[in-house]
């Protein structure tokens, strides 16, 4: 079969095949002899790789988005003197004739020089760090919600029907009742009357009936442990909120404008900026933005 040469559109490039413990890099281009080297994924080794690429005059670097292993490589290679591209593995997955790691890196390099690779959008470092904070906060919020559901299940196990007579166990009265149950294992009608609020739909008598369960030492221990975990997690969430506010302080005007949109709270705006940023020039059309935000159908056939 006749070999068809690629037209070179990039001056000097490097293709990198990334693995957990090793990266294989191939350089080629104008004035360069094609060369392949392997490096460990330790920071010192990746720094050596960066120095080799810069000394060789490499202008573009391309690598597949392999799991999470590409991230430290990207962070170390990222610099003003080189464009580092992360490419979708599907763009080169089905190309035949490359079975070893060295050939993989050489093939990526060849496709890069020919201009046949399209870089994925990678947010700036500041936005990536902000996204780490907001996503971690959301995970912790989900954890607190999960622990609330665990409390409901434990109370149901004790045949305490608070969740059936109050709208939410987050309310002031419900929290005080749970605290009393944890402290003493029971509540009295007088205690319910003292903390009762007229806004509650349930009567004091109905609350008392709902609290007439059989709470045991094991249940008390579980409830105490869960409440302690929730309090600690809420403290971390509050710390994260302060850190996020500090990071977003340069964009306070943008945030105020976005919060004028009905339904957008401050937290929602913080999450929005963390996910899509404030520079919409990164997205050619609204469809690209929707795809990046994960709110459009996918086709993975």
Feature map (PLM): residue ranges:
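A detector of single, family-specific signature residues
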Residues: 1-301
């Amino acid at each position: 079969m006749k070999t068809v040469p690629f037209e070179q559109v990039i001056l000097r490039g490097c293709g990198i095949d990334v693995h957990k413990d090793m990266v294989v890099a191939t350089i080629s281009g104008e004035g360069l002899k094609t060369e392949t080297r392997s490096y460990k994924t330790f920071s010192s080794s990746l720094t050596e790789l960066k120095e080799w690429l810069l000394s060789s005059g490499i202008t573009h670097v391309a690598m597949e988005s392999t799991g999470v292993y590409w991230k430290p490589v990207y962070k170390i290679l990222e610099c003003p003197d080189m464009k580092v591209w992360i490419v979708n593995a599907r763009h080169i997955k089905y190309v035949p004739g490359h079975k070893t790691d060295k050939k993989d890196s050489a093939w990526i390099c060849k496709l890069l020089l020919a201009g046949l690779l399209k870089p994925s959008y990678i947010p700036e470092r500041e936005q990536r760090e902000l996204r780490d904070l907001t996503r971690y906060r959301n995970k912790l919020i989900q954890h607190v919600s999960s622990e609330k559901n665990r409390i409901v299940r434990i109370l149901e196990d004790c045949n305490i029907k608070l969740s059936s007579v109050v709208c939410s166990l987050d309310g002031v009265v419900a929290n005080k009742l749970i605290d009393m149950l944890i402290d003493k294992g029971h509540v009295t009608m007088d205690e319910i009357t003292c903390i009762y609020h007229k806004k509650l739909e349930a009567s004091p008598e109905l609350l008392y009936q709902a609290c007439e369960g059989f709470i045991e030492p094991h249940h008390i221990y579980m409830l105490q442990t869960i409440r302690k975990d929730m309090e600690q997690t809420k403290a971390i969430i509050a710390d994260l909120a302060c850190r996020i506010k500090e990071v977003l302080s340069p964009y306070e005007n943008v945030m105020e404008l976005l919060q004028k949109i009905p339904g957008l709270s401050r937290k929602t705006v913080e999450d929005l900026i963390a996910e899509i940023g404030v520079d919409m020039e990164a997205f050619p059309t609204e469809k690209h933005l929707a795809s990046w935000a994960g709110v459009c159908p996918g086709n993975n056939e």
